[in-house]
Amino acid sequence: MNLNQYYGTGRRKTASARVFIKSGISNGRVIINKRTLDQYFPRNNTQSIIIRPLKITNLLDKLDIYITVKGGGISGQAGAICHGMTRALLQYDEKLRGVLRSVGLVTRDSREVERKKVGLRKARRRPQFSKR
């Protein structure tokens, strides 16, 4: 029984995820920070973001996935895991690149929070203007 491990790092906003894919003897488990997917992300929309690369490549129940994720919030962590999983899947099988690229999962989402400016309330929100 050949047990292979593949690794991918994903980032989104301030979150970073390390994804380990193990093939061989597997039953489709997804473990995030030593908790199951349902325990770590109880909402269905974040679960679907994470599982998306596996569904597209039809590998949902064929691989065991172990993830450690740090920083950011729920959305950022889900995006980081998705990106890391895509990179690990590309290590697992380079032929998946075309399928994952067509859906837009290979490219990192580089959007970051814009910094707050001096004299403004937020990044772009100005104080209320009074003519008189």
UniProtKB/Swiss-Prot annotation:
Keywords: Ribonucleoprotein, Ribosomal protein. The keyword Disulfide bond does not apply. Disulfide bonds: none annotated. Coiled coil: none annotated. GO terms for cellular component: cytosolic small ribosomal subunit. Belongs to the universal ribosomal protein uS9 family. This is Small ribosomal subunit protein uS9.
